[in-house]
C-alpha cells in the first residue's frame, strides 16, 4: 500500500505540520505517521513548442531572459527577447526564437 493512504482504514492521509516536522494524518481514524519526504506536490512545467504563445506574457516579465534591439514584424517595436526552447525535437532545439516585448509576437 502507498504511504499516501492510512494503514489502518485505507483513507487518504493529509499533510500536517507539528514542531517543523511534516506528518501525514488520517482524518477518519486519527492515525499519524511521519512523512518520508518533505515534498507535498510537484508540478513539472515543460511547455511544448506549440504552446510558447500561451506563456509569452510570462516570458516578457522574466528578467533572466536576454533582450535584443530588433524590430518586430508585427508592430514595429524595437525591443524583444530571444531564447532557445528546450524540446524533444532537434530542429526546434536548434532554433532561436524572438519575442516582441510589446505585442508578444513570436518569430524565428
UniProtKB/Swiss-Prot annotation:
PROSITE patterns: RNA_POL_M_15KD, ZF_TFIIS_2. Zn(2+) 2 binds at residues 72, 75, 100, 103. Its main location: nucleus. A zinc finger (TFIIS-type) spans 68-108. Pfam families: Zn_ribbon_RPB9 (PF02150), Zn_ribbon_TFIIS (PF01096). Disulfide bonds: none annotated. One of its GO terms (biological process) is maintenance of transcriptional fidelity during transcription elongation by RNA polymerase II. Zn(2+) 1 binds at residues 6, 9, 26, 29. GO terms for molecular function: DNA-directed RNA polymerase activity; nucleic acid binding; zinc ion binding. Keywords: DNA-directed RNA polymerase, Metal-binding, Nucleus, Transcription, Zinc, Zinc-finger. GO terms for cellular component: nucleolus; RNA polymerase II, core complex. A zinc finger (C4-type) spans 6-29. It is found in: Nucleus, Nucleolus. DNA-dependent RNA polymerase catalyzes the transcription of DNA into RNA using the four ribonucleoside triphosphates as substrates. Component of RNA polymerase II which synthesizes mRNA precursors and many functional non-coding RNAs. Pol II is the central component of the basal RNA polymerase II transcription machinery. It is composed of mobile elements that move relative to each other. RPB9 is part of the upper jaw surrounding the central large cleft and thought to grab the incoming DNA template. Involved in the regulation of transcription elongation. Component of the RNA polymerase II (Pol II) complex consisting of 12 subunits. Belongs to the archaeal RpoM/eukaryotic RPA12/RPB9/RPC11 RNA polymerase family. This is DNA-directed RNA polymerase II subunit RPB9. It comes from Encephalitozoon cuniculi (strain GB-M1).
